[in-house]
């Protein structure tokens, strides 16, 4: 009935170790099917991302411990030269459930509240289910984790506020110009940072985006992806600065690509209509003197990082609420686990009483009328349910600190002389 979790993540191991243990989808399927076909596990799932590789296993043998699973995956990845057991964490029973709930809720992420992890957990579950490795325990564990993540997202603010430079830039632009769909935007630089900023803008309903890049084909590819198909030659974009309400720069360069003189002329043509320049370059792309011009809002990476720090601080204040949700769901999950543990005993108890009832009724089958037999059957059913009510209620009751589930199960099995159950999980 145990659920073990072992793995490496950004807290326990550096990236070069995490890379050695990570599994592709094909390797993931091979790994978990090997555990099950080898008789080592009843159920298994692997969550493998850039920041973590974690095993969730319902062992089929007492020998399959946390240490055993660490050694098993190290051997599977042929990583003995690089990876040691100390790089791993281990969780057991409800500790495993708590860990997955925290992971799914994005409070165990490298960036607090980074919501991408939930999709990755769902993908891990899909893979396990696809190869019939997700049984009743892992299925319930994962669906509870999905429910926890949904509650955390709707009932807390742990995922609110930008925590990346590109998203912080867009969030700031939206605060200054509330309706981005009405603004004309110039993106200078179509690299990774610029692309992210453009996609965040697009997600905020900005559609009037013009792109310029030293390599024009790269600008054209991004414009096509966004569906704007609007590109300016890099050699001539400065001639159009006055046309834009928002300018995002994300270019690798030693010199300023937009000077104070460039924007002074642009502002005169705009008749001082406000402009935001979001400088995502390092070194900076825009001359800091631009910020002194009237109706000019210039924000560089340092200013945006200040916004990010504030947002992370606000997110951390939500942690008590998140833990409260997790604690509540953990209690319910633990109670379900306990019910699962006693299910064989409840079934055996009911079966024994049904067997006794049927044997006794059989003795009178030819001594009484069919109507009398039906009445006797109805009466014995009622008596049986009343007798069984209390022992079943006791078995299902939550465990207190002075009690434990095995002693309850043993008591009932001994009192009612039940045969030892077959151990499956």
From Swiss-Prot:
Active-site residues from the entry: 50
Q: Does the keyword Oxidoreductase apply?
A: yes
Record's keyword terms, sorted: Chlorophyll biosynthesis, NADP, Oxidoreductase, Porphyrin biosynthesis
Pathway stated in the Swiss-Prot or TrEMBL entry: Porphyrin-containing compound metabolism; protoporphyrin-IX biosynthesis; 5-aminolevulinate from L-glutamyl-tRNA(Glu): step 1/2; Porphyrin-containing compound metabolism; chlorophyll biosynthesis
Binding positions (substrate):
49-52, 109, 114-116, 120
Is this entry keyworded Oxidoreductase? yes
Site description Important for activity, residues in chain? 99
| Entry protein name | Glutamyl-tRNA reductase
Q: Report quaternary structure and partners.
A: Homodimer.
Q: What does the entry list as the binding residues for NADP(+)?
A: 189-194
Q: What is known of its domains?
A: Possesses an unusual extended V-shaped dimeric structure with each monomer consisting of three distinct domains arranged along a curved 'spinal' alpha-helix. The N-terminal catalytic domain specifically recognizes the glutamate moiety of the substrate. The second domain is the NADPH-binding domain, and the third C-terminal domain is responsible for dimerization.
Q: What does this protein do?
A: Catalyzes the NADPH-dependent reduction of glutamyl-tRNA(Glu) to glutamate 1-semialdehyde (GSA).
Q: Where is the signal peptide?
A: none
Q: What else is known?
A: During catalysis, the active site Cys acts as a nucleophile attacking the alpha-carbonyl group of tRNA-bound glutamate with the formation of a thioester intermediate between enzyme and glutamate, and the concomitant release of tRNA(Glu). The thioester intermediate is finally reduced by direct hydride transfer from NADPH, to form the product GSA.
Q: Which InterPro entries match?
A: 4pyrrol_synth_GluRdtase (IPR000343), 4pyrrol_synth_GluRdtase_dimer (IPR015896), 4pyrrol_synth_GluRdtase_N (IPR015895), GluRdtase_CS (IPR018214), GluRdtase_dimer_dom_sf (IPR036453), GluRdtase_N_sf (IPR036343), NAD(P)-bd_dom_sf (IPR036291), Shikm_DH/Glu-tRNA_Rdtase (IPR006151)
Q: What is its EC number?
A: 1.2.1.70
Source species, domain of life: Bacteria
Q: Which reaction does it catalyse?
A: (S)-4-amino-5-oxopentanoate + tRNA(Glu) + NADP(+) = L-glutamyl-tRNA(Glu) + NADPH + H(+)
Molecular functions (GO terms): glutamyl-tRNA reductase activity; NADP binding
Q: What class of enzyme is it?
A: oxidoreductase
Q: Give the GO biological process terms.
A: chlorophyll biosynthetic process; protoporphyrinogen IX biosynthetic process from glutamate
| NCBIfam families per the UniProt record, alphabetical | hemA
Q: Which organism is it from?
A: Chlorobium luteolum (strain DSM 273 / BCRC 81028 / 2530)
The encoding gene is hemA
**Protein family membership:** Belongs to the glutamyl-tRNA reductase family.
């Amino acid at each position: 009935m145990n659920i073990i979790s072992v793995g490496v993540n950004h807290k326990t191991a550096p990236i070069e170790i995490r890379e050695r243990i990570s599994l592709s989808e094909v390797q993931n399927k091979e790994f978990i099917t090997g555990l099950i076909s080898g008789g080592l596990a009843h159920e298994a799932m692997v969550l493998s991302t850039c920041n973590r590789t974690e095993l969730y296993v319902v062992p089929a043998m007492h020998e399959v411990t946390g240490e055993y699973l660490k050694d098993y995956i190290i051997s599977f990845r042929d990583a003995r030269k690089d990876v040691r057991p100390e790089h791993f964490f281990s969780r057991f029973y409800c500790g495993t459930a708590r860990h997955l709930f925290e992971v799914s809720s994005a409070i165990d992420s490298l960036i607090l509240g980074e919501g991408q992890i939930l999709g990755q957990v769902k993908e891990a579950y899909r893979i396990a289910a696809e190869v019939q490795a997700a049984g009743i325990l892992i299925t319930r564990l994962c669906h509870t984790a999905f429910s926890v993540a949904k509650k955390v997202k709707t009932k807390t603010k742990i995922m609110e506020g930008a925590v990346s430079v590109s998203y912080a830039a867009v969030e700031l632009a939206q605060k200054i110009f509330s309706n981005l769909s009405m603004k004309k935007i110039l993106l200078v630089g179509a690299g990774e940072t610029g692309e992210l900023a453009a996609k965040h803008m697009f997600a905020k309903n900005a559609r009037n985006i013009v792109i310029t890049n030293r390599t024009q084909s790269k600008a054209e590819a991004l414009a096509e992806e966004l569906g704007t198909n609007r590109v300016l030659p890099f050699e001539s974009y400065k001639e159009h600065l006055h046309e834009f309400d928002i300018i995002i720069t994300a270019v690798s360069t030693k010199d300023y690509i937009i000077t104070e003189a460039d924007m002074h002329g642009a502002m005169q043509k705009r008749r001082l209509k406000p402009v935001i320049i979001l400088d995502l370059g390092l070194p900076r792309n825009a001359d800091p003197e631009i910020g002194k011009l009237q109706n000019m809002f210039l924000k560089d990476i340092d200013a945006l990082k200040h916004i990010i720090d504030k947002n992370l601080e606000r997110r951390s204040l939500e942690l008590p609420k998140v833990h409260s949700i997790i604690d509540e769901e953990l209690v319910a999950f633990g109670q379900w686990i306990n019910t699962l543990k006693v299910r064989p005993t409840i079934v055996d108890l009911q079966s024994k009483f049904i067997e006794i009832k049927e044997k006794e009724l059989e003795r009178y089958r030819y001594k009484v009328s069919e109507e009398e037999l039906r009445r006797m059957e109805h009466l014995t059913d009622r008596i049986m349910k009343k007798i069984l009510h209390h022992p079943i209620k006791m078995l299902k009751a939550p465990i207190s600190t002075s009690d434990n589930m095995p002693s309850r199960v043993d008591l009932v099995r001994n009192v009612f002389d039940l045969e030892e159950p077959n151990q499956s999980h």
